[in-house]
Amino acid sequence: MPEFDFLLKLSLFRTSLKAQQTVIHDFWEKAQMLLAGSEIHLKPVPKSWLSLRHNYFSVLFIALFHVLEIPAPRLRLYARLNHCLRAWVTACDNLLDKELKEIILTDLPAKAHTFKSVHTILLTDRIFFSFLMDALDQKIINTAEVEQLLNISLSAISISGREEAEEEGGVMDTPRPDQILQKVHLAKTGHLFAAPLSAPSALGDIDPNQATAKLARNGLTTFGLGCQILDDISDLGQDINDRKYNYLISLIHHRGTHGEKKRLQQLYEDGNLSDHDGLEKLYQVFPEASQQALADGTRQLKKALRSFSECGLPLSSLNRDIFIKILVTVFRHPERFYHLRDR
């Protein structure tokens, strides 16, 4: 698995990782207090969960908060709330995709995949509110701002949730690749990646019309689109099973070779692919379309990195080249991207 530790040579990313580590400890401490006296017991934070590898996206968001010059007390609050957002999204994805990527570790039975995710949502709701009450007590926010943050915590992820709901139970159409990217994936993932900016924008710590803020938002949105294309490559088999929108499926359907189109049709007709069919590597059956999807995903990520650099992240041309080289290594084995998706 490629590492992103080269970023730790940059002081901004070291500072941002330390901030995220503090957030995780704060989150764990709140969980411990809330679970005290219950029948569910919290386990210690795994050391690996404090690494850059496990918190790559969260660290990126915090680094952007610094670049956008958000005052330290508010930045700390937004980083805490963003971790709650991460927990909600991860748990909801688990329920929608019938999988388990844990963000809270308890002594609940290993087989309890569904309830673990339900419990994460319930517990995170209370942690989120406790973080708000702490900020209110410390006069970091006022009562009206508590109300704003409660509202924005739902509305910021509702666009993505609406798209997930539209696809639940399966879809029968196959939009063109450009429609998948600019409509479906923009709603599902593009806006979701930009959601961490919603709270500071709502409270006036970021001016959405200011040039740097626009670059940050556009960069996050584009980064989300690139990540979703990678997600679609590794999720090809599952999305065929569930009849969900998928960029690679769209490429095959609208632009694929005759052979690739025929293979895709056969997979739909066969139905119910299992894990034994190598779902994470099914893209290899469609080499030409997969190569195009990788190129399109790379293009989106390169565009995002340029935006991040222009808005002030210390990503020089050399750093961006290193970044892309690492990402390309991931792209050559898209099934590995599965392990980065909840970061």
Describe the predicted segments one by one.
Residues 71-77, 142-145, 209-212, 293, ...:
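Residue-level recognition of alpha-helical structural elements
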Residues 291-343:
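Short hairpin/turn module used for nucleic-acid contact or packing/dimerization
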Residues 63, 90-112, 124, 166-170, ...:
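Acidic, Mg2+-coordinating active-site segments of isoprenoid diphosphate-utilizing enzymes
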Residues 84, 88, 121, 217-219, ...:
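Small-residue hotspots
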Residues 122-144, 255-307:
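Primarily interfacial, aromatic-capped hydrophobic alpha-helices that serve as membrane anchors
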Residues 1-107, 163-176, 326-343:
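Conserved N-terminal diphosphate/IPP-binding helix and adjacent helical/loop segment
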Residues 82-96, 114-134:
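Internal, hydrophobic cores of structured domains that mediate oligomerization or house catalytic pockets
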Residues 19-36, 45-60, 118-230, 234-240, ...:
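All-alpha helical catalytic cores of prenyl diphosphate-utilizing isoprenoid enzymes
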